[in-house]
A protein has these predicted regions:
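Fe(II)/2-oxoglutarate
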Residues: 139-142
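TRAFAC-class small GTPase G-domain
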Residues: 1-134, 144
Length: 144
């Protein structure tokens, strides 16, 4: 379990599963999707194929989980702006079309630009959804 402070300052515990696109996990992904409380999905802004693969994952999520599951899309490697293959507006429009939040990050730039923010936002969305559905219970939530 990982403790994350939401964007509103609440501290909650989350189970985070990082598949990093590993093919080894393919047989288990549908089961994880069914029990997940939210998704933080990354693609590389300098790799259009990773953006297209992300779209396939979203279809799989929508098929195996509720339509209103919190999703945060993340365009990673924003330090490689000169090599960008996925237009920021295209990513923003896609995120909006599926009801997701969108951020761009870089794990290499000073202070890991927006890395903490994406986890906080995902946590906030999950906690908000959980609180609206189940009053008075703590959130044993999972992010995949």
């Amino acid at each position: 379990m990982t403790q994350i402070k939401t964007s509103t300052g609440e501290e909650r515990h989350f189970k985070i599963l990082d598949t990093a696109g590993e093919d080894d996990y393919q047989t288990m992904i549908d089961e994880w999707i069914k029990v997940a409380d939210g998704f933080l999905l990354l693609f590389a802004i300098n790799d259009k194929e990773s953006f297209e693969a992300l779209k396939a994952k979203i279809i799989r999520i929508k098929k195996n989980n509720k339509d209103k599951i919190p999703i945060v899309l993340v365009g990673n490697k924003c330090d490689l702006e000169s090599k960008r293959e996925v237009d920021k507006q295209v990513a923003l429009d896609y995120a909006k079309s599926i009801g997701a939040k969108y951020y761009e990050t870089s794990a290499l730039t000073d202070e890991n630009k927006n890395c903490k923010v994406v986890f906080q936002q995902c946590a906030h969305l999950i906690v908000s959804k959980f609180n609206s559905e189940v009053k008075g219970k703590s959130c044993p939530c999972s992010i995949y």
